[in-house]
Amino acid sequence: MDHLPIFCQLRDRDCLIVGGGDVAERKARLLLDAGARLTVNALAFIPQFTAWADAGMLTLVEGPFDESLLDTCWLAIAATDDDALNQRVSEAAESRRIFCNVVDAPKAASFIMPSIIDRSPLMVAVSSGGTSPVLARLLREKLESLLPLHLGQVAKYAGQLRGRVKQQFATMGERRRFWEKLFVNDRLAQSLANNDQKAITETTEQLINEPLDHRGEVVLVGAGPGDAGLLTLKGLQQIQQADVVVYDRLVSDDIMNLVRRDADRVFVGKRAGYHCVPQEEINQILLREAQKGKRVVRLKGGDPFIFGRGGEELETLCNADIPFSVVPGITAASGCSAYSGIPLTHRDYAQSVRLITGHLKTGGELDWENLAAEKQTLVFYMGLNQASTIQQKLIEHGMPGEMPVAIVENGTAVTQRVIDGTLTQLGELAQQMNSPSLIIIGRVVGLRDKLNWFSNH
């Protein structure tokens, strides 16, 4: 280990930055956030430093560097574009046994600045020892996405509860289980964010008085249409906390690779006309695992409430008094159209969008007359096997045969395929595509040639 990670208490302590440009400004923000009593020395300053000085937040010393500026300092930073001056600042600091950071010159510095994830009072620092700042930044960004924004408020509140929790729970194991409940409680986090004192008190009392062998819970998470980058931040957090993940075939391998490694994985994939696991059995799997006290994530492609049977699954849980919540996902209509260069609405072509299931059943006839109207976009989910029927019905009810159509296969994935044509060709086009596919019908499809950005990447 070349560097010892430490956290410095700098509040109301003298610190010095030598440099008045953009780099120095970024360092100054960090020291000001830490409460340091900051002096900045340079020949000239960018406007932000002047604004801070006018607000009484720091002291500016305009002119050449003088070593006496270090006399009362706890910490210094050399942030100029003059290597010789930076070296001089570093040597002067070292002679006084003051830690000094030299920007972009870790070998000349006595301390280096890590990449920081600030969820105060919770802080995470990431460093490559100065060898690869870009790698440290990328790792910080990954960790940033895993840590909820409200985590700091929860940590601060937890500090206020420590005394009571120690009195309430006799053993370390009981206290640990309580803290685990508190730190994943979304209602408490939201109440803290809103400063809702009544809800904070109610939720805290419920958590403290709730038996430790409490029921599990189920979270319905929308995984989006395929591209792992479209998974929401909250969705990622949920799959990282899950004990069990119940998923279907529309969830990509890239997203499954983000699931907590020691979580149990239950595949319940389904295809049109063929169910690997009957829906009722899926409902029972969710119920059974939650009743064991586990945190269960039901991970679905797209959005769980748009042709995802999410409502059916939640009704089962509700009837059994199992706690549940829902994390929406980007639905296939939105993702596939965007990655195909097809805007679902457009002032000139479509003032509304209809999302329609392609599972056409006897006795469940659609309102084809309204679907055939102009100035709208139709999006058929799971409609590949019914493409010829869709074509026939729309034409019969007055939609022009030259109406533009597109079929998107594996939308948003690197294997995405898009084929377009007219309504009279829809049945023929469908024979060239495989599931999962989405059918888009409307004048907006005609914009694809101009707006298609994804295939060009």
UniProtKB/Swiss-Prot annotation:
<dbReference type="InterPro" id="IPR006367">
    <property type="entry name" value="Sirohaem_synthase_N"/>
</dbReference>
<protein>
    <recommendedName>
        <fullName>Siroheme synthase</fullName>
        <ecNumber>2.1.1.107</ecNumber>
        <ecNumber>1.3.1.76</ecNumber>
        <ecNumber>4.99.1.4</ecNumber>
    </recommendedName>
</protein>
<keyword id="KW-0169">Cobalamin biosynthesis</keyword>
<dbReference type="InterPro" id="IPR028281">
    <property type="entry name" value="Sirohaem_synthase_central"/>
</dbReference>
<comment type="pathway">
    <text>Cofactor biosynthesis; adenosylcobalamin biosynthesis; sirohydrochlorin from precorrin-2: step 1/1.</text>
</comment>
<feature type="binding site">
    <location>
        <position position="382"/>
    </location>
    <ligand>
        <name>S-adenosyl-L-methionine</name>
    </ligand>
</feature>
<feature type="region of interest" description="Precorrin-2 dehydrogenase /sirohydrochlorin ferrochelatase">
    <location>
        <begin position="1"/>
        <end position="204"/>
    </location>
</feature>
<feature type="binding site">
    <location>
        <begin position="331"/>
        <end position="332"/>
    </location>
    <ligand>
        <name>S-adenosyl-L-methionine</name>
    </ligand>
</feature>
<keyword id="KW-0597">Phosphoprotein</keyword>
<feature type="binding site">
    <location>
        <position position="306"/>
    </location>
    <ligand>
        <name>S-adenosyl-L-methionine</name>
    </ligand>
</feature>
<dbReference type="InterPro" id="IPR035996">
    <property type="entry name" value="4pyrrol_Methylase_sf"/>
</dbReference>
<dbReference type="InterPro" id="IPR019478">
    <property type="entry name" value="Sirohaem_synthase_dimer_dom"/>
</dbReference>
<feature type="modified residue" description="Phosphoserine">
    <location>
        <position position="128"/>
    </location>
</feature>
<keyword id="KW-0949">S-adenosyl-L-methionine</keyword>
<dbReference type="Pfam" id="PF00590">
    <property type="entry name" value="TP_methylase"/>
</dbReference>
<dbReference type="Pfam" id="PF10414">
    <property type="entry name" value="CysG_dimeriser"/>
</dbReference>
<dbReference type="InterPro" id="IPR014777">
    <property type="entry name" value="4pyrrole_Mease_sub1"/>
</dbReference>
<feature type="binding site">
    <location>
        <position position="411"/>
    </location>
    <ligand>
        <name>S-adenosyl-L-methionine</name>
    </ligand>
</feature>
<keyword id="KW-0808">Transferase</keyword>
<feature type="binding site">
    <location>
        <begin position="301"/>
        <end position="303"/>
    </location>
    <ligand>
        <name>S-adenosyl-L-methionine</name>
    </ligand>
</feature>
<feature type="active site" description="Proton donor">
    <location>
        <position position="270"/>
    </location>
</feature>
<dbReference type="InterPro" id="IPR050161">
    <property type="entry name" value="Siro_Cobalamin_biosynth"/>
</dbReference>
<feature type="binding site">
    <location>
        <begin position="22"/>
        <end position="23"/>
    </location>
    <ligand>
        <name>NAD(+)</name>
    </ligand>
</feature>
<keyword id="KW-0520">NAD</keyword>
<dbReference type="GO" id="GO:0043115">
    <property type="term" value="F:precorrin-2 dehydrogenase activity"/>
</dbReference>
<comment type="function">
    <text>Then it catalyzes the NAD-dependent ring dehydrogenation of precorrin-2 to yield sirohydrochlorin. Finally, it catalyzes the ferrochelation of sirohydrochlorin to yield siroheme.</text>
</comment>
<keyword id="KW-0560">Oxidoreductase</keyword>
<keyword id="KW-0627">Porphyrin biosynthesis</keyword>
<dbReference type="InterPro" id="IPR012409">
    <property type="entry name" value="Sirohaem_synth"/>
</dbReference>
<dbReference type="InterPro" id="IPR003043">
    <property type="entry name" value="Uropor_MeTrfase_CS"/>
</dbReference>
<feature type="region of interest" description="Uroporphyrinogen-III C-methyltransferase">
    <location>
        <begin position="216"/>
        <end position="457"/>
    </location>
</feature>
<feature type="binding site">
    <location>
        <begin position="43"/>
        <end position="44"/>
    </location>
    <ligand>
        <name>NAD(+)</name>
    </ligand>
</feature>
<comment type="similarity">
    <text>In the C-terminal section; belongs to the precorrin methyltransferase family.</text>
</comment>
<dbReference type="Pfam" id="PF13241">
    <property type="entry name" value="NAD_binding_7"/>
</dbReference>
<dbReference type="InterPro" id="IPR006366">
    <property type="entry name" value="CobA/CysG_C"/>
</dbReference>
<dbReference type="GO" id="GO:0019354">
    <property type="term" value="P:siroheme biosynthetic process"/>
</dbReference>
<dbReference type="GO" id="GO:0009236">
    <property type="term" value="P:cobalamin biosynthetic process"/>
</dbReference>
<feature type="binding site">
    <location>
        <position position="225"/>
    </location>
    <ligand>
        <name>S-adenosyl-L-methionine</name>
    </ligand>
</feature>
<dbReference type="InterPro" id="IPR014776">
    <property type="entry name" value="4pyrrole_Mease_sub2"/>
</dbReference>
<comment type="similarity">
    <text>In the N-terminal section; belongs to the precorrin-2 dehydrogenase / sirohydrochlorin ferrochelatase family.</text>
</comment>
<dbReference type="InterPro" id="IPR037115">
    <property type="entry name" value="Sirohaem_synt_dimer_dom_sf"/>
</dbReference>
<keyword id="KW-0511">Multifunctional enzyme</keyword>
